[in-house]
Amino acid sequence: MKRYDKYDELYLLEAIQDAGLKNVQVIASDEIRQKMIDKFVDFSLNKSDERIFLNFKEPTNVYYKNSYCLQVLKNNPQKGKFYLFAEESKSCLVLNNWGEVLEILENLPYMNVYILDELLSYVISVTEEDNMIFTGIELNEKFRNYKE
C-alpha cells in the first residue's frame, strides 16, 4: 500500500484518486473555486484582532442552519486546522492534517465533499443523513494575503 505525506495537499489529492472515492470532488479551477466561495460563504476580516469571520449565506442554505459551526469558527478559528461538526450532538472534531481528513472521508462514504485548493484550502463536507450536518473548514495564510 502506498504511503502519503499527511501534510502535503498534493499527496492527499493523489490518495483520494487512488482510493476511488466517488463522493469527493476536487475543484482546481480558479473560476469554479470562486463560484463555490461566492455561493456558500461571506468572509470578512476583523482588523482589530485579525480573525476571519465566516457567515454562511441564505437562510435556506444547509450551512446556515449549523449555528454551532458558526459559533465555533467565529470565536476561535485556527489557521491550518480542519473542523468537522455534528450539528445534532453539538460536537466539533478538529483535524490537524490532510491525512486525518482522508481517514474521515474513507470512513464516512455517504458524505458529499468538495475540496478547493491553493488560495483557499477549503473543505466542505455535508450530509443530512441521520439528521446530521458536517462542515469542515481550513483557514490558511494564503487566504489572508489573497483577500486583503
Question: Where would I find each of the regions flagged by the language model?
Answer:
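Structured alpha/beta or helical-core interaction and ligand-binding surfaces enriched in interleaved
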Residues: 1-131, 137-148
